[in-house]
Regions:
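Short, basic/glycine-rich phosphate-binding loops at helix/coil junctions
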Residues: 1-3
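Alpha-helical packing segments of well-folded alpha/beta enzyme cores
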Residues: 18-21, 25
Length: 166
């Protein structure tokens, strides 16, 4: 295999442009519509911590990341806004997520029950979003009567607070 020499690549992010875009998007929405800024994969390679620090004082309601490690990185950099973890979180990391005030994605009744038990043990109510599988066959509840019943069961768990569904 030959060694390849490649030119360095970089992207310059103009924060004023982000602010301009955000303000224009906000104008199109109803006043009480919430905005979640997705910062997964280091804000798609543009610096999640830097972007989060900039947006924290703007008219944004949530941040979202793919993995728990990304959420923890934001918390370790003093990001206080709500952070939704969109992806899988191992059972052994659920308590750590709760302790760091990370909103979790629920994609099965089994996971919800485990999280409810951990929430009860720690005394920390878990904020959650319910994930619906929209056809990608990754994670989420299928469009079925059984899933509806499971989501109703989740809504009756005492230590979980359903903030949203996607």
């Amino acid at each position: 295999m030959k060694n390849r020499v490649t030119a360095p690549t970089w992207a310059e992010i103009n924060l004023d442009n982000i602010n301009f875009n955000l303000n224009n998007i906000r104008k199109l929405l109803k006043e009480d519509t919430k905005i979640c800024t997705v910062l997964k994969a280091n804000a798609y390679g543009h610096g999640s911590v830097e972007i989060a620090k900039f947006l924290e004082n703007k008219n944004v309601d949530y941040f979202a990341v793919a993995r728990l490690e990304e959420a923890i990185e934001l918390r370790e950099n003093n990001i206080k806004m709500p952070i939704l973890c969109l992806g899988f979180v191992p059972e052994e990391s659920l308590e750590y997520a709760l302790e760091n005030n990370i909103t979790l994605t629920i994609y099965s009744l089994e996971m919800a029950k485990k999280l409810n038990d951990i929430s009860e043990k720690t005394g920390i109510t878990a904020n959650i979003h319910i994930k619906i599988d929209t056809g990608m066959s990754r994670i989420g509840f299928e469009a079925s009567e059984e899933s509806i019943d499971q989501i109703v069961n989740i809504s009756n768990l005492n230590n979980l607070y359903i903030e949203g569904i996607y």
